[in-house]
């Protein structure tokens, strides 16, 4: 009875799907045929969306029935589900087309007429996509069969070795499907990059169809050499990316199948065995938790005082609770305090690593390698040392060692070895309180030494101020140290740039002043004892002049004092006696040199045949020898990557995507290589340069708009720039004064006068390399560059001047001066209107 009701429900859903698909297809056909009525098209799209929603709900019902073992006929469920998914894909395509902007890059590419090769490439790509989808559908159908076999094997009555054999066979089929999908995906990607000939794919099309249609036939024989002739591994980057994607997909499929098989194996066990496995798992979890807890407990060692040893994690908390207490929590010996205060952070980290690698039970107090030093700061800014036992890594980084303290330790290690030994002998018989005070004094000296080695700051707000809480003091200290470092770097950079631009070295006037060092020391140690500061300053006065010069660091911060001492007053008059030569050309000289080089390169057609690297070398040498390019030795890193050009790229022009740039450069280079026969043959025949130039232009006129724009801005030689500009002008493109926008009028002018014109325009923007469409756009003539006849300039350079009428040239120049720029454009506009 229940089975009959379920079958009736399935039939009812099938009927609804058939009706919904019929309605959907009728709406879809009307939508595709509707091209002139946008409102009707939008209404049909909303109707399609409503029908797809209904079909999606029915598809969810079918998916639930597919996973249920009550329904035997799963093939019909799969067919109806696939028909609904096809309708969903159709609607997705309709929705994507409706969301595309009218003049986006995709729409403009669609509007262009495709050549036969592009159409063939698109057809082959669609064919490969269909084959990949068909193999995916077959993969899903086999996965359904595998799930069925797994359900049968769960029960002892239906379990058999035949099911396992079928399952393994289906998995082998799925592995072959994935391999063929990977090869087709590689071919698809290579076709998109124009690295694979569509005809090669056509040659193996029959073999691919045979595999897709007949791979499960009994007499099927697979040919694994189908894709050998396509050379799919030519692009290693694409091959690696596709292989990585399919490897992750296979791993995901294997994990899913392993999980299903493990559930099947567990279900075969008896309840008693399952309970036994659960008990063993619980015991293992408890044992692991116990081991983790034991490893986190530090081993306490013998201390020199009755007070307990403070752990690493609680050391800073104890310091915050008792600000007035001694900074050393474990009363260590003064000798150990002095030794640990001059250790570097690296040594303490090295001592920590072996202790972490050993087990907690093997850590004993007698092993000296297991002891490490934890350096921290008290609220008044003095560092202290605590001897700790090995423990696990804390959640908070162990220690708050500042970079100034670490730097001063390395300096003081060399100049205070003798004073440290005397301090050890004098303080060995003192009480613990005296020892703590001595350690405090040594740490204060360390901070003063750090201040002496730090560039002076003119901002008084960066000095350390006392605070009530330890946390706020630590934060203020960290902020001051970071600000000091940033200010020092900024000051060093400014001084370095001043040095590069000045005629005399600035280190002569930047001699260090002991008074400034004294001010830095007193500013940093406002919170420390006064007697400690005085004692350190007295020790500093007793030092020899050589040591004082070693410790003094000028505020310039870039060069050492040795360089300053090497300078002698005798060398300065020699520099003054040298004749002063101008480093840079004036603006008029620069323009004259630029025009001269431009005329020379525009008339040299053989530069088009040179590789880009040779062109760049020639241009940079010419610019450097003519003093147009700066001869200063100092250059920024980004300047080293710039290509030398006679005309720089405008400020608002950004480079396109690397793939588009590579494609444009490749097309341009192919055209340049094809000019070899034209240029060399014309020179042998001694043809006129104007005829050679016309042949060159004719060769470049086949290029697309994007390549012309790219090479107008990023080509190396002036001749290439002139060629691109000439062809763009022939196609009625007009460029703005700043060179960041180009305008192309569509149709006739709607309004014009001497100042502006109004019409429909295509605007090419160089900041993002996109074309936008503007209706009724007002174009001011003052915003455009004046029109330049590049062909006449080239010919004036190359043609012999004996046959040129000088009077006509003068008349032309007089006309250009008399007629304004707006009138010239208006005249050209009228001519264009008449031609339209």
Curated annotation (Swiss-Prot):
Q: What is the lineage of its organism?
A: Eukaryota, Fungi, Dikarya, Ascomycota, Saccharomycotina
Q: What is this protein called?
A: General negative regulator of transcription subunit 3
* Stretches with biased composition (Low complexity): 418-446
Similarity remark: Belongs to the CNOT2/3/5 family.
- Regions annotated as coiled coil: 36-68, 119-195, 255-292, 803-831
**Family annotation (PANTHER family):** CCR4 NOT-RELATED (PTHR23326)
Q: Where are the compositionally biased (Polar residues) regions?
A: 252-267, 341-386, 447-468, 522-531
Q: What gene name does this entry carry?
A: NOT3
Query: Which GO cellular component does the record give, naming just one?
Result: cytoplasm
- A Pfam family name for this chain? Not3
Q: How does it assemble?
A: Forms a NOT protein complex that comprises NOT1, NOT2, NOT3, NOT4 and NOT5. Subunit of the 1.0 MDa CCR4-NOT core complex that contains CCR4, CAF1, NOT1, NOT2, NOT3, NOT4, NOT5, CAF40 and CAF130. The core complex probably is part of a less characterized 1.9 MDa CCR4-NOT complex.
Q: At which residues is the cross-link Glycyl lysine isopeptide (Lys-Gly) (interchain with G-Cter in ubiquitin) found? A: 535
Among InterPro entries, the record links this protein to: CCR4-NOT_su2/3/5_C_sf (IPR038635), CCR4-NOT_su3/5 (IPR012270), Not2/3/5 (IPR040168), NOT2/3/5_C (IPR007282), Not_N (IPR007207)
Task: Indicate where this protein is primarily found.
Answer: cytoplasm
Where does the record place the region Disordered? 252-284, 296-391, 410-471, 513-532, 537-583
Q: Which UniProt keywords apply?
A: Activator, Coiled coil, Cytoplasm, Isopeptide bond, Nucleus, Phosphoprotein, Repressor, Transcription, Transcription regulation, Ubl conjugation
Q: Where is the composition biased (Basic and acidic residues)?
A: 268-283
What other note does the entry give for this protein? Present with 2490 molecules/cell in log phase SD medium.
Where in the cell? Cytoplasm; Nucleus
Q: Which organism is it from?
A: Saccharomyces cerevisiae (strain ATCC 204508 / S288c)
* Residues modified to Phosphothreonine: 571
Q: Where is the composition biased (Acidic residues)?
A: 559-578
Q: What does this protein do?
A: Acts as a component of the CCR4-NOT core complex, which in the nucleus seems to be a general transcription factor, and in the cytoplasm the major mRNA deadenylase involved in mRNA turnover. The NOT protein subcomplex negatively regulates the basal and activated transcription of many genes. Preferentially affects TC-type TATA element-dependent transcription. Could directly or indirectly inhibit component(s) of the general transcription machinery.
Query: Which GO annotations describe the biological process of this protein?
Result: deadenylation-dependent decapping of nuclear-transcribed mRNA; nuclear-transcribed mRNA poly(A) tail shortening; positive regulation of transcription elongation by RNA polymerase II; protein ubiquitination
According to the UniProt record, list the residues that bear Phosphoserine.
303, 307, 322, 446, 450, 565, 569, 657
């Amino acid at each position: 009875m229940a089975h009959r009701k379920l079958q009736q429900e399935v039939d009812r859903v099938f009927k609804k799907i058939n009706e919904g698909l019929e309605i959907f297809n009728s709406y879809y056909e009307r939508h595709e045929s509707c091209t002139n009525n946008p409102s009707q098209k939008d209404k049909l799209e909303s109707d399609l969306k409503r029908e797809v929603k209904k079909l999606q709900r029915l598809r969810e019902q079918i998916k639930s029935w597919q996973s249920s073992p009550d329904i035997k006929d799963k093939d019909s469920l799969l067919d109806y589900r696939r028909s609904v998914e096809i309708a969903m894909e159709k609607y997705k395509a309709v929705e994507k087309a409706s969301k595309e902007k009218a003049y986006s890059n995709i729409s403009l590419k669609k509007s262009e007429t495709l050549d036969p090769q592009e159409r063939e490439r698109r057809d082959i790509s669609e064919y490969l996509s269909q084959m990949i989808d068909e193999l995916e559908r077959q993969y899903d159908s086999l996965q359904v069969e595998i799930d069925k076999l797994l359900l049968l094997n769960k029960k002892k009555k239906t379990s058999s070795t035949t099911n396992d054999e079928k399952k393994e066979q289906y998995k082998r089929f799925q592995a072959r499907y994935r391999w063929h999908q990977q090869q087709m995906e590689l071919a698809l990607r290579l076709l998109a990059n124009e690295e694979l000939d569509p005809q090669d794919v056509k040659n193996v099309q029959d073999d691919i169809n045979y595999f897709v249609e007949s791979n499960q036939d009994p007499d099927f024989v697979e040919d694994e050499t189908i894709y050998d002739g396509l050379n799919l591994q030519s692009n290693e980057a694409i091959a690696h990316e596709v292989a990585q994607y399919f490897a992750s997909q296979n791993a995901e499929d294997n994990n899913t199948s392993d999980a299903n098989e493990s559930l099947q194996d567990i279900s075969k066990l008896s309840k008693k065995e399952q309970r036994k496995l659960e008990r063993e798992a619980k015991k293992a979890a408890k044992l692991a938790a116990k081991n983790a807890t034991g490893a986190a407990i530090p081993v306490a060692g013998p201390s020199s005082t009755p007070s307990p040893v403070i752990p690493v994690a609680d050391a800073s908390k104890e310091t915050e609770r008792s600000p007035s207490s001694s900074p050393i929590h474990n009363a260590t010996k003064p000798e150990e305090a002095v030794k640990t205060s001059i250790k570097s952070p690296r040594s303490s980290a090295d001592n920590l690593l072996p202790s972490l690698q050993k087990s907690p039970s093997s850590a004993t107090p007698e092993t000296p390698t297991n002891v490490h030093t934890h350096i921290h700061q008290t609220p008044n800014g003095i560092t202290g040392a605590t001897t700790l036992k090995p423990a696990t890594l804390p959640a908070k980084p162990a220690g708050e060692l500042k970079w100034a303290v670490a730097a001063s330790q390395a300096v003081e290690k060399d100049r205070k070895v003798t004073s440290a030994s005397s301090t050890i002998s004098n303080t060995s018989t003192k009480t613990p309180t005296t020892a703590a005070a001595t350690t405090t004094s040594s740490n204060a000296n360390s901070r003063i030494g750090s201040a002496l080695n730090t560039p002076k700051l003119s901002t008084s707000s960066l000095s350390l101020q006392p605070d009530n809480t330890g946390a706020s003091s630590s934060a203020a200290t960290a902020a001051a140290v970071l600000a000091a470092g940033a200010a020092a770097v900024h000051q060093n950079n400014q001084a370095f740039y001043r040095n590069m631009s000045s005629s005399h070295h600035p280190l002569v006037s930047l001699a260090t002043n002991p008074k400034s060092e004294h001010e830095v020391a007193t500013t940093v140690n406002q919170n420390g004892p006064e007697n400690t500061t005085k004692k350190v300053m007295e020790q500093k006065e007793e030092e020899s002049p050589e040591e004082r010069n070693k410790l003094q660091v000028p505020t310039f911060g870039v060069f050492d004092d040795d360089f300053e001492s090497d300078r002698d007053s005798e060398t300065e008059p020699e520099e003054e006696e040298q004749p002063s030569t101008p480093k840079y050309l004036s603006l008029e000289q620069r323009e004259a040199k630029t025009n001269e080089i431009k005329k020379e390169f525009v008339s040299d057609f053989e530069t088009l045949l040179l590789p880009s690297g040779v062109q760049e070398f020639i241009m940079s040498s010419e610019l450097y020898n003519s003093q147009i390019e700066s001869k200063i030795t100092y250059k920024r890193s980004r300047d080293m990557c710039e290509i030398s050009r006679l005309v720089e790229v405008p400020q608002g022009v950004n480079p396109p995507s690397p793939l588009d740039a590579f494609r444009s450069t490749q097309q341009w280079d192919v055209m340049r290589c094809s000019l070899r026969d034209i240029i060399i043959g014309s020179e042998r025949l001694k043809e006129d340069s104007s005829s050679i130039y016309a042949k060159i232009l004719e060769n470049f006129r086949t290029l697309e708009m994007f390549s012309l724009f790219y090479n107008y801005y990023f080509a190396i030689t002036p001749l290439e720039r002139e060629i691109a500009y000439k062809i763009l002008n022939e196609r009625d493109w007009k460029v703005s004064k700043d060179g960041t926008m180009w305008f192309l009028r569509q149709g006739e002018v709607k309004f014009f006068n001497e100042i502006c014109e109004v019409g429909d325009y295509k605007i090419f923007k160089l900041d993002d390399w996109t074309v936008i469409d503007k209706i009724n756009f007002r174009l001011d003539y003052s915003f455009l560059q004046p029109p330049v006849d590049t062909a006449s300039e080239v010919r004036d350079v190359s043609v012999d001047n004996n046959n040129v009428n000088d009077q006509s040239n003068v008349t032309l120049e007089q006309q250009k001066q008399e007629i304004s720029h707006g009138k010239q454009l208006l005249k050209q506009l009228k001519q264009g209107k008449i031609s339209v």
